[in-house]
Amino acid sequence: MRFTENFERAKKEALISLEIALRRGEVDEDIIPLLKKINEKPNYFTTSSCSGRISIMEMPDFGDKVNAKWLGKWHREVSLDEVLEAIRKHREGQLWLLVRSPILHVGARTLEDGIKLLNLGVSCGFKYSNIKSISDRKLIVEIRSTERLDALLGENGEILVSDDYMRKLVEIANAQVRRFKRKLKRFEERIEEL
């Protein structure tokens, strides 16, 4: 398959892009050791990643990411005060609390390599992992988990939820972060199996 022939060039390009992103501070710090371990493997390279996050987002309509604004974004557990501070910035459109699990896009040299990575991800709890794409240029495996939360908090400047409800949402969001960070650690510890 042609992606196997193009692997070295695709890996070189991806590593250059990663180095630029690292210098700019655009890579989630807690995932950098895992990215380095994957990229040290001769048959793999990372193309994009997120270590998972809790965010407060204001958007005209749900799903309108183009016109959305981050009012708060954290790749770690958060305090109720941090979330309330972000919520107070809400002025227009819909206000959402969002939790997103980690996501890694990894190029693999061969289909067999891709399947090995996919199986490792699933065995570490990343149940939504899949082969994202196969083209002449590259084969991409997506490592993704199940944790997700979407909660409408306000609309057009009005907060629709109580502080007690917010407290509960923050507890749930932090529990999800703890869960997916454990999965990431397990995946990092087992990456040597590839």
Swiss-Prot record:
Keywords: Methyltransferase, S-adenosyl-L-methionine, Transferase, tRNA processing. SUPFAM superfamilies: SSo0622-like. It catalyses: 4-demethyl-7-[(3S)-3-amino-3-carboxypropyl]wyosine(37) in tRNA(Phe) + S-adenosyl-L-methionine = 7-[(3S)-3-amino-3-carboxypropyl]wyosine(37) in tRNA(Phe) + S-adenosyl-L-homocysteine + H(+). GO terms for molecular function: tRNA methyltransferase activity. InterPro entries: Taw3, tRNA_yW-synthesising, tRNA_yW-synthesising-like_sf. One of its GO terms (biological process) is tRNA methylation. Its EC number is 2.1.1.282. PANTHER family: TRNA WYBUTOSINE-SYNTHESIZING PROTEIN 3 (PTHR48418:SF1). Belongs to the TYW3 family. NCBIfam families: PRK04235.1-5, PRK04235.1-6, tRNAMtaseTaw3. S-adenosyl-L-methionine-dependent methyltransferase that acts as a component of the wyosine derivatives biosynthesis pathway. This is tRNA(Phe) 7-((3-amino-3-carboxypropyl)-4-demethylwyosine(37)-N(4))-methyltransferase 1. The gene is taw3-1.
